[in-house]
Structure formats: structure tokens, C-alpha cells
């Protein structure tokens, strides 16, 4: 494979992971904006499942050397901070 093709695959993989992370971030934002039912078990289950799925996607991309481990950690870290904000907001409510 040419260097251009490899770079293209790497960029596409990272863009797809960022897109999936953005969808989860939006779920978190919606819950933060609508804290009508703090600690909704169903919502928490959905977020946990989405986060687990994304972590598996990231792990797979790292193992295929499509993204750097640091890039993957950064994506998860940003979402984990958002989740911490959500949990903090539900405790205050």
C-alpha cells in the first residue's frame, strides 16, 4: 500500500471515531440540559454501552495501527470528563 493510502485510512479511521465520540458527547449534553430525572438508569445504561463500544472501536483501531494510542486515549478522556460533569450535575440536583 502506498503512503498516501495508509495516511488516508488513518485519517478516515480517526474521523469515524471522532464522529462516534461526538454522538456520545451529544447524548451527554442532552442529559445535562434536561436534568429532569437525575440518574436515570436507562440513560446511564445507554451511555455506558456507548462508551464501552467506542472504547472497543478505539482499541481495534490502535491494534490495526490506524490511530496512535494517545489519540484514542484523548478521545475517551474528553468523554469521561463530560460524563464526570453529568454525574456531578446529577448529584447537585
UniProtKB/Swiss-Prot annotation:
Record's signal peptide: none
Q: Which InterPro entries match?
A: UPF0358 (IPR009983), UPF0358_sf (IPR036270)
Per the UniProt entry, the disulfide pairs are: none
* Family of this protein: Belongs to the UPF0358 family.
- Matching NCBIfam families, A to Z? PRK13666.1
Q: What is this protein called?
A: UPF0358 protein BH2626
Q: Which organism is it from?
A: Halalkalibacterium halodurans (strain ATCC BAA-125 / DSM 18197 / FERM 7344 / JCM 9153 / C-125)
